[in-house]
Amino acid sequence: MLIPYEQLQAETLTRLIEDFVTRDGTDNGDDTPLETRVLRVRQALAKGQAFILFDPESQQCQLLAKHDVPRELLD
């Protein structure tokens, strides 16, 4: 299920994004400051280039690029 980012509390959204951008394998040796990486994800969410996917089975949220979201969820 896709969760509109606007429906999350500001602090919750920030923590979700920070968790995503600081995970192993997401920085690829990039020394970009955390604030910049968070801003980029916020912009991608606002432009519809990224989405928050909630899996009710695992009770986990994921941030996905639009091309990684199952097509049936975008319709």
From Swiss-Prot:
Q: Which InterPro entries match?
A: UPF0270, YehU-like_sf
Q: Name one Pfam family in it.
A: UPF0270
Where are its TM segments located? none
> What family does the entry list?
Belongs to the UPF0270 family.
Stored HAMAP family: UPF0270
For this protein, the record's NCBIfam families field holds: PRK00304.1
Recorded protein name is UPF0270 protein PputGB1_1339
Species of origin: Pseudomonas putida (strain GB-1)
